[in-house]
Amino acid sequence: MSSSFTTTLAGMAVGMLVLATGTNPTLAQDKPTVGIAMPTKSSARWIDDGNNMVKQFQAKGYKTDLQYAEDDIPNQLAQIETMVAKNSKVLVIAAIDGTTLTDVLQQAKDRGVKVIAYDRLIRGSENVDYYATFDNFQVGVLQGSYIVDALGLKDGKGPFNIELFGGSPDDNNAYFFYNGAMSVLQPYIDSGKLTVGSGQVGMDKVSTLRWDGATAQARMDNLLSAFYGNRRVDAVLSPYDGISIGIISSLKGVGYGSPSQPMPVVTGQDAEVPSIKSILAGEQRATVFKDTRELARITVEMVDAVLGGGTAVNDTKTYDNGKKVVPAYLLKPVSVDASNWKGTLVDSGYYTEAQFK
């Protein structure tokens, strides 16, 4: 993919954006503080998200309060309460557990604070104004489609053995990723061209709490020892790069990745540097890139619209949080593998080539 990717995507986003500001938009010199609550620094992705938002908000004259909760729910609740108490006018929240924020968001509502759910839907609260994210079902479709294409299933090849991994059960996105992938894979499972060797299907059986790579590695260890003593696994659906790295460590531990035992097709998401290096080394096969610069930009546009009395959405039907359908803006994800990583990630300026040396 050429360096025009970012320009094209930005142009599409601007063209699709429904932006209706009021007659008295907030003046630049009066722009308030935006509280940004991120889940953890353990993933490079969230560090990049936070930094991108701070940079773009401050460029527009906003003050920012960026906090990381290190995947500790009480810590995130306390951070959000403090942001409200310190008069943040808008909260941008990537929730650790999207079901735990009802009370603190009521506090925000009572003080007139607007709330934007960032990439992870906040559930069970009426007090979520907007949701900025990617097309999460499509992320799963890309992952499932990559497996289908890599194995040659459309050409009638098979049967093959596959194992399924899901994301964290407390993250609404995990279900969209899984359902998107299964919308592609299930017909091949039903026809017998794909066999789930362990028989473990469904988010209640395949989820990975907190998206933890070590947890995924331990589960993969168990699957290999219990179900693959005399057969090989040909593909592993992984929803996230950190999980993929754990899966690959397990596979390498029993000899996969050698000439006599090729690595299965392993998917991923977020285009994190370790996984791109793994792709270049011939281990992980693909990932899904979500340009967080664009997500940050759309979030800033949302805040501008919220404070100006307008809206900034392109989806008003998909994301029901149990209390309301949250108006959302969905960005387009991109599949990345060894054939297009440089054009997509380096030529667009997202990474430098030196990061992969």
UniProtKB/Swiss-Prot annotation:
Gene Ontology molecular function terms on file: carbohydrate binding
Location in the cell: Periplasm
Signal in keyword set: yes
GO cellular component: outer membrane-bounded periplasmic space
Residues spanning the signal sequence: 1-20
InterPro entries named among the record's database cross-references: Bact_Solute-Bind_Prot2 (IPR050555), ChvE-like (IPR049784), Peripla_BP_I (IPR028082), SBP_2_dom (IPR025997)
Induction: Induced by D-galactose, L-arabinose and D-fucose. Not induced by stress conditions such as nitrogen limitation, osmotic stress, salt stress or temperature stress.
Keyword list, A-Z: Chemotaxis, Periplasm, Signal
Gene Ontology biological-process entries: chemotaxis
Misc: SbpA from A.brasilense cannot complement an Agrobacterium chvE mutant with regard to vir gene expression.
Family: Belongs to the bacterial solute-binding protein 2 family.
UniProt function note: Mediates chemotaxis towards D-galactose, L-arabinose and D-fucose but not towards D-fructose. Probably part of a binding-protein high affinity uptake system.
Protein name as annotated: Multiple sugar-binding periplasmic protein SbpA
